[in-house]
Amino acid sequence: HVWDNTPYPEFNKKFYESNDLIVAISKVTDDIIKTVAPAIESTYLPHAVDASVFKKHSEEDIKVFRNEYFPDSEEKVLFFWNNRNARRKQSGSLIFWFKEFLDIVGKDKAKLIMHTEIKDQHGQDLEEIINYLGINNGEVLFSEKKIAPEILAKIYNAADCTINISDAEGFGLATLESLACGTPIIVNMTGGLQEQITDGENWFGVGLEPTSKAIIGSQDIPWIYEDRLSREVVVDALLKIYNMSPEERSKLGDLGTKHVMKNYNFENYVKRWDEIFTQAHNKHGSWQNRKNYKAWSFSEVT
């Protein structure tokens, strides 16, 4: 289960209590379940990364890859954004703010690579935005085609920083994959992104505290926070990464890789799921002998 944010969703209590066990994929979600439905058994098990695919490549291999896929980028800082083009992902805001960043450092100093659909019905027309802003000469590059995980891993390696400024994010796999490849991240401190950017002692990029919080919702979800960032803090974060030396960025990324391998590795992930399923089956039964469940009920007929 994943729930992106507080305030605590008391309206979920009846749903939580209809389960024998809930597995939370983020620390935020784990806290929410334990607070809203403390009587229900729950455990924390986050996403994991396949280290055989998402790993650091040699400098020589990445130099060849950059020259092939991103020509004329050798002296430029590459920022990577790998998300769906949807409203909460803040794709349009990022492009506008990246333009302001380029106005400071120079159009020939950095590139933004966006692996997404340019005209997703749930997002903005990104092509129209770059044309309007006059950054349609290679300053922003779009990657729309589906690509193999191995190629995606090389893009993470080629990038100097991966960005996720979503106003709501259950976990955020792209930034986790980036850290596994040794590339630091810029993230909004919301949802599962908070546990990726720091282990409580070290930081693996730039974590941005929300500038403001808005309560949004719907008929089914009466309330939830939406964590928003301002133009100023995002531009400052881009500048901070840009002004670092390659060695400083590499150090952040290497620390991030250790964080991922320790806390989000596939070996522990598979082992924990096996333990969870086995323990749940032993404790609660299966379809034929499930405990705490009746397939029938009595009702009065008049």
Label the model's feature ranges.
Residues 10-11, 34, 49-68, 124:
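Acidic anion/phosphate-binding donor-loop and adjacent secondary structure
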Residues 72-89, 95-98, 112-113:
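Conserved donor-binding/catalytic core segment of Leloir-type glycosyltransferases
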Residues 167:
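Aromatic "clamp/platform" in nucleotide-sugar-dependent glycosyltransferases that forms part
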Residues 215-227, 231-302:
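C-terminal amphipathic helix plus adjacent low-complexity
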Residues 184-187, 197-198, 204-207:
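Short hydrophobic beta-strand element within catalytic cores of glycosyltransferases
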Residues 109-126, 145:
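Glycosyltransferase donor-sugar binding loop
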Residues 28, 48:
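Carbohydrate-associated surface elements
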Residues 123-150, 154:
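Nucleotide-activated donor-binding/catalytic signature segment of Leloir-type glycosyltransferases, i.e.
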